[in-house]
Amino acid sequence: QKVMDNYEKMLECYASDVKDPKLPEVYAGIKSFCHNLVHHLLMYQVIQNDSFFRSASDSSKNLDLMQIGERIEKGDIDEDFLNLAFSYILTVRQWNGKKLSYFADIVCNPATDYRAAALMISAAMLSSIKVFDYNMMTTLFDIWKKSKDVKISERALVGWSVIMMSVDSEQYPYI
């Protein structure tokens, strides 16, 4: 409801030619909400229509990024955990800036097991290829710049590049 109220106020400002200093902020909020909503709906559709994504989503329903980070910090990594982490990241709905930053911190942390970091990058890349996520794509670019581990940096750059090549430029002209 708040988004609709903001939208109505924005239209009133445009119609009456009022120069509200908060208008760009309101517009950015509406735009962000709409992008997030579209991403959620597209990912939901993929999960419903693709058996691999449905299985991945079902298997990782009880997991979140904080749990992944905590287990990686403890070094509590086994094949089952890596499969769950991959499934979670593959089917996650769009993250906010705080979660994306946490994701990048986990991946770039020198103490993070290489297998876990590489797997997280691969899952993010595959997810963003299936349902484009601009924020995840730019996060992979940031990981490329930020990581001190050459292999992680290269993997993030490859992920970013593959996402860039898979983007429909007509649907996303700002890319």
Stretches found by the model and what they are:
Residues 12, 16, 34, 141, ...:
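Long, charge-dense low-complexity segments
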Residues 67-146, 159-171:
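Alpha-helical solenoid scaffolds in large eukaryotic transport, assembly, and signaling factors
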Residues 1-77:
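Extended, helix-rich scaffolding/adaptor regions
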